[in-house]
């Protein structure tokens, strides 16, 4: 895994591999390195690159709101910079939604999408969520948690122990959790480490969840939604709604929650590779 960052360009990580190009878009708060196990499995068959979302590299303070189309355009910019012709997209959570937005904007660039527990909400749910966020931007429970999260730890081990006790990570292995800790925290003098993806940016992403129905309808490439059977983001009703919008959308489920690609990276990789192979 090699990291690349140049002025004026979207930063990315190379995970190696040969063959067709695959670009990965990560979830809110989880840098590409968090998914090392998953992406190394994919790199056994494809040339894999993880694109960093704007909260990891922007020098600007997090705004209250920012359209997710901005992250989609960043993804498109990185793909164009790479010189790749037609690529596969894999994304998790907001990264999967950003991938869908990107593919709906420039369909000729993409061979297919694997969306791992993507953020998809119906138009009605989106309306009420957006209204509440506009009226009380810091009142949403998920926003409150993001703004309250600690940003400093004595060292990486202290950060690991903190997260190890959190319910959200209870089905994530120690090794994958450490991948997240190392990817999401940077040293700042001595051993002390600082959170790279600030709570303010995380909250901005949560407040700005987009309406997705139009993008789903406009998809031209095949897409597989891989949902966790214990996901608190995707319900059976939502999956039925999404798959009913476009005949190119398939749905499958795996054992796990919203952090499915961290909880079951091997299973996610196998499903993704099978889908890619069947759509070549």
Predicted regions: what they are:
Residues 23-27, 92, 227:
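The conserved beta1-alpha1 loop
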Residues 49, 53-90, 129-131, 270:
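Active-site loop/oxyanion-hole signature of alpha/beta-hydrolase fold enzymes
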